[in-house]
Each structure stands twice: as structure tokens, then as C-alpha cells.
């Protein structure tokens, strides 16, 4: 069973529906005590970093997420859920994150329309089962005003261009993350969620 973490933000039902469509059972939870029961976790998200991390800490879910990851269980962060994995964000000031990955979350540079909303193509940098069946130039759906400016270049598996190169997929051990929304990315996104489900059996 895959747990979808509910902290008051994100496309929870869309993620749940997409997972079920590709054949995986999922349950939405806001109960920190329940997190340990899941084989894998997904942290989706649309919203402000400071608000999100505040809720995760207050509810005890932040600590349970860290325990889940430390145990080697599969974890997927989507959009804001990816950004929350980093050390800190400069959205609305400076806020510490979950510190799973090294680096910061910063605002997209001026020049292009902000927020970055819509379809953009992926450039695949490394092979991974997470991106099985995904090709260079495949389009996925983005909605964000901030991006990861991190120190995890060795773990970048795909990027996109929006005035600058933006990390689109970062994978480190059992932790998977994507800046785009697979649940909104049509057949390409469904393939990625199916791949994540298949990898749960292998990790």
C-alpha cells in the first residue's frame, strides 16, 4: 500500500486516482502514526514551502517521513514535495526543510513568465527504472515559481529548460523526486507512476 501524505496542500485525489489507474492501491493520510504502516510514501504538493513544513512538523509527519526514508522504504516527492526534501527554501524568507537532499530552493529568475505553468520537455541525463519508457523530449506538466538550486548534480536524472536548466528528476537511493506533476502529465506521467510502483517491489 502506498501512502499519500495529506498536509492540506496538493493534488491528493489526482495522485490517488492516477495510482489506482496504473494498478496500485493508495491511501491518503494525515495521521503521523499511520505512516509507518505503508510500504511507500508520496509527498505531493502545491503551495507555500513555509506553510507546508510547518504543518509537517506540527503533526509529527516530518519526523515519520525521515524515519521511513532512513529505513530504506521508497519515497516520492512531487513538486513542492520535492522541494521540501532540501535543506532550506528562500520562499517568503528563509525556512529549513527536511534536509534529505543538500541544497536550497530559490525563486525562478526574472525573464520568463512566473509561475512556470504548463507543458515542458525533459532532457534525460541518466538511465533509471523510474524513467523507463520516457524519452528525451517527452513533455510533462509543471506548476512552480521556485526551483531546486542544489548540490545534488550527481543525482539529477532529468532536467528541463525554462530560461535556465532546472532539475526535473532527482533520485538518491530510495528517495525519488520530480519537480513536475506526473499525475497531470498524461501518459508520460502515468508511466512514471507505474514505474515507481514497480520499483517498490525491488527496493
Swiss-Prot record:
It holds the Pfam family GATase. Transmembrane segments: none annotated. InterPro entries: Class_I_gatase-like, GATASE, Imidazole-glycPsynth_HisH. Keywords: Amino-acid biosynthesis, Cytoplasm, Glutamine amidotransferase, Histidine biosynthesis, Hydrolase, Lyase. GO terms for biological process: L-histidine biosynthetic process. PROSITE patterns: GATASE_TYPE_1. Its main location: cytoplasm. One of its GO terms (cellular component) is cytoplasm. It is found in: Cytoplasm. The active site is at residues 79, 181, 183. The keyword Magnesium does not apply. Pathway: Amino-acid biosynthesis; L-histidine biosynthesis; L-histidine from 5-phospho-alpha-D-ribose 1-diphosphate: step 5/9. Its EC number is 4.3.2.10, 3.5.1.2. The keyword Lyase applies. It comes from the Bacteria. It catalyses: 5-[(5-phospho-1-deoxy-D-ribulos-1-ylimino)methylamino]-1-(5-phospho-beta-D-ribosyl)imidazole-4-carboxamide + L-glutamine = D-erythro-1-(imidazol-4-yl)glycerol 3-phosphate + 5-amino-1-(5-phospho-beta-D-ribosyl)imidazole-4-carboxamide + L-glutamate + H(+); L-glutamine + H2O = L-glutamate + NH4(+). Residues 1-203 form the Glutamine amidotransferase type-1 domain. PANTHER family: IMIDAZOLE GLYCEROL PHOSPHATE SYNTHASE SUBUNIT HISH. IGPS catalyzes the conversion of PRFAR and glutamine to IGP, AICAR and glutamate. The HisH subunit catalyzes the hydrolysis of glutamine to glutamate and ammonia as part of the synthesis of IGP and AICAR. The resulting ammonia molecule is channeled to the active site of HisF. NCBIfam families: IMP_synth_hisH. Heterodimer of HisH and HisF. This is Imidazole glycerol phosphate synthase subunit HisH.
